[in-house]
């Protein structure tokens, strides 16, 4: 059961870290809505904006100004949150790899490997927090901006909605939460053994064999009184 839970958590951690990294460095956080009067598809990301012509499929991208330039608060905060989530998710996944039983790292220390899995789970839980905050906040801001324009009957010729990069960030964050929950909440399921499992199997087997041989070789000495009593009982 322990191995199965570890592999499930590793599966979610791998794809979650990948989703977060792809979401951070792709350009479709905002995409023009279907009701926009545009002949091209516009996508806005955290680092650049791309336009794809609907007729010939030509795609052109323009990078934003320098990082030190003034940017909207939504863009700056989302960048910081997603980069933090990427680093933590990657670190959590690599840490989890060291804690897997199939990895030849500290093979004689199962208790330490369980602790490594616990640290990886806690890191993944922490990684999901900035990821989900950044993704949801960006999506809500896009929705509120669009709803405000519609409410005040303001039409700028193009309306935006959040795109697949935003969805990918949410999925990666939820995956981090799930992997972290499996590793932390199920930690006691990993401890399905007693204290003797802190020693390698070969040593436990050697100790057991030595104990059996010592028990067989040892016989309590018989006193003279016991011998006399045995003779009397036979008579």
UniProtKB/Swiss-Prot annotation:
InterPro entries for the chain: Claudin (IPR006187), Claudin16 (IPR003927), Claudin_CS (IPR017974), PMP22/EMP/MP20/Claudin (IPR004031)
UniProt cross-references to Pfam families, sorted A to Z: PMP22_Claudin (PF00822)
Cytoplasmic topological domain residue ranges: 1-3, 101-115, 191-235
Entry keyword set: Cell junction, Cell membrane, Disease variant, Ion transport, Magnesium, Membrane, Primary hypomagnesemia, Tight junction, Transmembrane, Transmembrane helix, Transport
Motif Interaction with TJP1: positions: 233-235
Gene Ontology cellular component list: bicellular tight junction; plasma membrane; tight junction
Phenotype when changing residue 81 to F: In HOMG3; localizes at tight junctions when coexpressed with CLDN19; displays almost normal interaction with CLDN19 yet it prevents functional synergistic effects on ion selectivity; impairs paracellular sodium-selective transport; may be retained intracellularly
Record annotation: effect of changing residue 79 to T: Low protein expression mostly retained in the endoplasmic reticulum; loss of paracellular sodium-selective transport
Biological process terms in GO annotation: bicellular tight junction assembly; calcium-independent cell-cell adhesion via plasma membrane cell-adhesion molecules; cell adhesion; intercellular transport; intracellular monoatomic cation homeostasis; metal ion transport; paracellular transport; renal absorption
Subcellular location, principal: other
Annotated phenotype, changing residue 162 to C: In HOMG3; localizes at tight junctions when coexpressed with CLDN19; displays almost normal interaction with CLDN19 yet it prevents functional synergistic effects on ion selectivity
Phenotype when changing residue 42 to S: No significant effect on protein subcellular localization or paracellular sodium-selective transport
Impact upon substituting residue 121 to R: In HOMG3; localizes at tight junctions when coexpressed with CLDN19; displays almost normal interaction with CLDN19 yet it prevents functional synergistic effects on ion selectivity; impairs paracellular magnesium- and sodium-selective transport; may be retained intracellularly and targeted to lysosomes
Ranges per topology, Extracellular: 25-79, 137-169
Keyword Membrane: yes
Result when mutating residue 163 to D: In HOMG3; retained in the endoplasmic reticulum and targeted for proteasomal degradation
Tissue: Kidney-specific, including the thick ascending limb of Henle (TAL).
Its membrane topology: Multi-pass membrane protein
Effect annotated for changing residue 81 to W: In HOMG3; retained intracellularly with predominant localization in the Golgi apparatus and further targeted to lysosomes
Transmembrane segments: 4-24, 80-100, 116-136, 170-190
Record-stated family: Belongs to the claudin family.
Assembly and interaction partners: Can form heteropolymeric tight junction strands with other claudins. Interacts with CLDN19. Interacts (via PDZ-binding motif TRV) with TJP1 (via PDZ domain). Cannot form tight junction strands on its own.
Task performed by this protein: Forms paracellular channels: coassembles with CLDN19 into tight junction strands with cation-selective channels through the strands, conveying epithelial permeability in a process known as paracellular tight junction permeability. Involved in the maintenance of ion gradients along the nephron. In the thick ascending limb (TAL) of Henle's loop, facilitates sodium paracellular permeability from the interstitial compartment to the lumen, contributing to the lumen-positive transepithelial potential that drives paracellular magnesium and calcium reabsorption.
Protein name: Claudin-16
Organism: Homo sapiens (Human)
Chain's gene name: CLDN16
